[in-house]
A protein has these predicted regions:
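N-terminal presequence-like segments and the immediate start of the first folded domain
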Residues: 1-59, 63-76, 82-131
């Protein structure tokens, strides 16, 4: 059995068609849990441009997925934390750029702050792949 993604006809369609409401992971799948990824460069510096910060956060998620031998199509759940509603377009643009046609179950949450006040985005992910 492969991973199944779907949207019930009895539930409102996903916002911007950017995700699926439901994902079923088969019992024989390897599951990867990715801690919240920030938009920090390898040297720990933070891009000052919000689009670059969002891109880097997504790039870090993808690096984790690929290191586990998986691809964007294997991402089954995203939870994103944003500190400013006005930054959502940056997040959405990067999401589209890095996920392409992948449509994992998703939640975006507006929070007062992350651990450091200058951080704008944090993205957690779960990926699964049949073995």
């Amino acid at each position: 059995m492969s991973i199944k993604k779907f949207n019930p006809n009895t539930v409102v369609k996903p916002f911007n068609n950017a995700y699926h409401h439901c994902v079923v992971i088969p019992p024989n799948a390897a599951t990867l849990f990715i801690s919240g990824q920030l938009g920090l460069n390898l040297d720990g510096t933070l891009p000052q441009d919000p689009q670059l910060e969002a891109d880097k956060a997504w790039e870090n998620v993808i690096e984790c997925v690929q290191e586990a031998g998986m691809g964007t199509e294997d991402i089954v759940k995203i939870t994103a934390y944003l500190t400013d509603e006005g930054d959502y377009p940056y997040f959405a643009n990067s999401r589209s750029k890095f996920l392409g046609d992948a449509r994992p179950a998703s939640t975006a949450i507006l929070v007062k702050a992350l651990v450091k006040k200058e951080w704008r985005f944090e993205i957690e992910a779960v990926a699964a792949k049949s073995v």
